[in-house]
A protein has these predicted regions:
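Bacterial Sec-dependent N-terminal signal peptides
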Residues: 1-23
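Beta-strand elements of well-folded, non-transmembrane domains
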Residues: 125-129, 142-146, 160-164, 180-184, ...
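Active-site/ligand-binding surface loops and adjacent short beta/alpha elements
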Residues: 165, 172-237
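Beta-strand-rich recognition/accessory modules
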Residues: 226-296
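Acidic (Asp/Glu-rich), glycine- and aromatic
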Residues: 48-51, 55-58, 147-192
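Beta-strand-rich N-terminal accessory domains
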Residues: 21-77, 281-283, 289
Length: 296
């Protein structure tokens, strides 16, 4: 076979490998749903009855295989990897402190689809506090895909339904959030950057932006994770609560219109959508801006 034909065959094979859809599988084991991509462990959705709220951990990078997020880190034991919660909800705390202050309880975590090019997980959760009427029910849906060998996506849709009139006082502890692994934090040489190219806590804190990304070097690899806000979200683009030590969250409840509280009536529904991009390379190399345009 000629050298040209060998090169042509290699290019065709490479293209086939790159275009081939990853096989994504999920299995429910006790209070976890474990997800693998092409046989490699990616993440678990954890909904144990002794946790404050359901969350994803680990969230393994596509290159290193290690989690890009961390659990119960140092001074902030309430940071559980990739999670959704809120403080100051009708006097309850569905973010930190003891379980008696408030919990988000999974009552129906299920695998809706698995085994092909995506996994779909659904859950129904009740926000519960002893001695108080439950203020919120939420329905959540997660779609996990892998468009390339270096990118994993978790598309998140959470519908909050107010079971009674709800008042959320101004709080920096609100809604969808992530705590990165220490080696990817700015304090340890990583980079935090938003859609406008601003970097670091000082430049990004309180700034409204469609997306935010953390990335850093781990061994021979650079890996990271971005959170994208969908344009249909209320308050889009929400200002971000960012910390150089590795925390980031689009946090509308910290910047309410009257600088005091957010009020919602019984029966009101709040639909929130996010895309989590777990990627090799930095934000530019992973083309996070292009992934946001596709997400819109």
């Amino acid at each position: 076979m000629s050298k040209f034909k060998l090169i042509l065959c290699f290019v065709i094979l490479l293209g086939f490998v790159q275009l081939r859809a990853a096989k994504i599988s999920a299995v429910k084991v006790g209070s976890k749903i474990n997800v693998t991509i092409d046989g490699k462990y990616f993440t678990s959705y954890i909904f144990s009855s002794d946790e404050k709220y359901p969350f994803f951990y680990p969230v393994n990078g596509p290159l290193s295989g290690g989690s890009v997020t961390s659990m119960r880190n140092g001074e902030y034991p309430h940071h559980s990897s990739l999670f959704f919660g809120c403080d100051q909800v009708n006097g309850g705390n569905y973010w930190q402190e003891g379980l008696e202050r408030g919990r988000i309880i999974s009552i129906n975590a299920e695998i809706l689809k698995e085994g092909g090019d995506s996994v779909v997980i659904t859950d129904e959760c009740i926000w519960s506090r002893p001695g108080a009427i439950s203020p919120v029910k939420d329905i959540r849906r997660f779609i996990i895909t892998s468009p390339s060998a270096s990118v994993r996506l978790i598309d998140v849709e959470i519908t909050m339904e107010m079971l009674i009139d709800v008042t959320i006082k101004k709080t920096n502890h609100s809604l969808f959030s992530a705590r990165m692994a220490a080696d990817l934090s700015v304090k340890n040489g990583g980079k935090l950057v938003n859609a406008e190219g601003m970097s670091g806590e000082k430049a990004t804190f309180g700034i409204a932006s469609p997306w935010m990304d953390f990335s850093g070097k781990r061994g021979d690899f650079v890996e990271g994770m971005a959170i994208l806000q969908h344009p249909s979200n209320p308050w889009f683009p929400s200002p971000w609560f960012t910390r150089d030590y590795g925390f980031f969250s689009p946090t509308p409840m910290y910047w309410p219109k009257d600088d005091k509280e957010t009020v919602m009536k019984k029966g009101e529904k709040l639909v929130l959508r996010y895309r989590v991009v777990v990627h090799g390379g930095n934000a530019s190399e992973a083309k996070v801006s292009e992934l946001f345009e596709q997400y819109k």
